[in-house]
Structures are given as structure tokens and as C-alpha cells.
Amino acid sequence: MRMRFFAAAACPVFLFFMVVAVKTAHAAEATYMGSKACAECHEEQYDKFKKYAKKANSSHSIKVMASDLTEGELKECFSCHTTGYGRPGGFKSFEETPELADAGCEVCHGPGSKHVDEGGGVQSIKSRLSIKDCEACHSEERVDAFNFKPMLFGGAH
């Protein structure tokens, strides 16, 4: 009898702490904000990115081709040509998350909310990029003639 009472009393308490733990862990994850949020502190880099980086307006190409693509093909486009597609808080649709519709700053540098919350600390954002980072989308099979150095070192921002 005692054991049943203890189990009945402990179950709601245990569930409460589990919910709090899950919510706290989820809140600790950085979320996507969109490139305009980056521009507030990184205006010069943002302006260069918008002017020189082809991916800064990648949603236009997807919208033009969308009617000729299957849902699967469209999702494949989203994985590289939008920000955070398929990840928590990432791009969902042009209507629901328009601020993430292009391949923006956070595609390379990661979700920016913690970076902003911590006052711009470099420990909460990817500041040094490597060719491996680019290869997530720019693999040989996807882009035969991709030249990493001009984008990585040549003023994409």
C-alpha cells in the first residue's frame, strides 16, 4: 500500500521535472534569426554579402523553378538554398518563415540567437570556416566546378 501511494505521488513530480528539463535544454539551443538580424551589428559584412554572394537571393531561383519540381526535389533545393531547412527553428515555407527563405549568414555561421543573446561572443557562433563547411552543399557531385577560395577568402563578406 505504501509503495502504491509513493508511486502515485512521485509520478506527477517526476513528470514535472522532466518537462522542465526538456524545456530548459530546448531553450539553450540557438535558433535561426535571419540575415537581417545579423546586419544590425555586422552592417558592412551584410551589405557585401547581399551585393556579392549569389546565395543571398537564392529563394528567387527556387520560386521560379518550383512549379516544375516534385515535392522531393523541392525539399532537396531547400536543404542548401534556404536557412536551416530541416532543423529546429529553420526554414519551413516562404509564407511561414520568409526571413529564412534565402541561404543567409546562418547557413555557414550557424543559428545566431545565442550569439546575439551573449552580446556577440564568438564562442556561440561559427566564426572560422573551412572547406569542409562549404562541402555540405558544394560537393563535387552537386557543383562540379565550385571554387572554394574565392567565396571563402575573397570578400563574400
Regions found by a protein language model. Give the residues of each.
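Positively charged n-region of N-terminal signal peptides that target proteins for export
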Residues: 1-7
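Generic secretory/membrane-interface signal
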Residues: 7-8, 17, 41
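Sequence context of c-type cytochrome heme-c attachment sites
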Residues: 24-130, 146-157
